[in-house]
Amino acid sequence: KEQKTIDSLSYKTIHINPKAVVDEVNLFTEKLSKNGYLSSKVIQERKANDSTFVFEFSLGQKIDFIQINTQKASFLRENKLVEKDTITIAFSETESFMNQLLHQLEVRGFSTSGVKLTNFSTDKNILKADLTENITAARHLDDIVVLGYELFPKGHKKQLKKRYRKKVFNKQILSELYDDVQKFVFVNQIKAPEILFTKDSTKVFLYLEKSKANNFDGFVGFSTDENDKMVFMGYADLVLNNLLNSGEQFKLYWKSDGQEQQTFDFMTELPYLFETPFALRGNLNIFKQDSTFQNTRTNIELGYYFNYNTRAYLGYSSMESNDIQNTNSLSLNDFENKFYTLSLEYFYPNRTDFLFPEKIRANIKSGTGNRVSNFDNNRQFFVSTEAFNNFYLNQKNIIHLKFQGYYLESDSYIISELYRFGGINSIRGFTENSLQANLFSGIMAEYRYVLAQTLYVHSITDFGYFQDQASGFNNRLLGLGFGLGLYTNGGLFNLVYANGSTDGQEIKLSNSIVHISFKASF
């Protein structure tokens, strides 16, 4: 019977040296103890030949249950961690039971406290023991110290301390702190946070370094217009994060096709103003449509950070539109509008995934105001939204779903105030900003397959619907295609081939568009 029990427990029979043999015997003895054979021992060991060792064990009485007396564990009893005077459990569950008690103490802030079993005795197959405790003072997080990046933004550090200081300290709090720091795209955590327990304080040390959080994508070319004048063409997309070590962000976007459209957009955001949860964001956007019209929009917003990735903004927006050709018609004329806006934003980064650094993003913005044109004065309301999520079926198969929507309510519409869309960041297969609408909704779907840690391919299936009441036109949109993404030391390269068509229009290869981008990180 004892031999059958021994054979049921796995052990290695081949070893590289005598020391490994002794280690295996000790490990096997420990296995016997965990299975209830506390009095097991080696009663004979012999060397059969130069390479064979034989050990004979006596198992003794097996312990099936443990009976734990809790009367000496007053703190555990007072806090309802144990409620009975005597607890009887299977002996194999002893380690799990003790670990659960330690976990419950740790969750309550008693990280340096301990429990143990003493005064052992046996009664046939039952082991009896007393549960004793060593309870130290509850731990609270007293300070957060940043090492490695001495110029870490003061506002961000203060808000971290404000959120976590004096909280009951446990592993969950440490994990939440780590996750919150991961949301700062401008820093890397060199290693996991470390804890320093002193007699009267608990400190957490963060080991940080400034990351390459800036991106640039673009090219510049030259061409001639119909009058043989040289014009610039190309685009530039620049994002600067934490350039001044205050956590600020600057975005600059410029695009010109040399003929029909020119776009200039500049945005800056200053977070944690005066080390408070408030932020300031400003934006200037200039859009010119050939020789038809030019729009100049300015936005100023005061933001509040509930936490770093959840924000709300109150803002004021104004736009001036010039009818360049002085058409002065109901559908195209000079106007000005002003809106008071409310925005909500949420994002969840995925810093460990180089190919898809953001898992979730959701933005919604609404505004109410009025438009004054050469013909009328209209009250207006708008709402715009964009949201996406990466659904990980597993590490290699990912479904990316994105929704975009826009609605402008007005008694009348002017062409130059309509929402413009189409292109790589919207319905793919259409020229950038070639579509316009007062109502638009679109769903963009991708099936992504990761070929390697730095390479993936994906399908493209985009659906959209829009209404253009200024032109009395509405239609459905379809974009189909495929693409790939490649992460290099320099940045992320994307190639997209997409074909766009409208409802009732035959899909033609001649309508296909290739989108290429390379975001360099520095």
Predicted regions and their residues:
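Periplasmic polypeptide-binding modules associated with outer-membrane biogenesis and secretion
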Residues: 10-224, 235-237, 251-258, 265-267, ...
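Gram-negative/organellar outer-membrane beta-barrel architecture
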Residues: 170-363, 391-393, 420-424, 433-437, ...
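Short N-terminal segments immediately surrounding and downstream of signal-peptide cleavage
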Residues: 1-11
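Glycine-centered flexibility sites
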Residues: 36, 60, 109, 136, ...
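A generic short alpha-helical patch detector that favors 3-5-residue windows
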Residues: 149, 354-356, 455
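C-terminal transmembrane beta-barrel domains of outer membrane proteins
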Residues: 237, 252, 265-267, 360-522
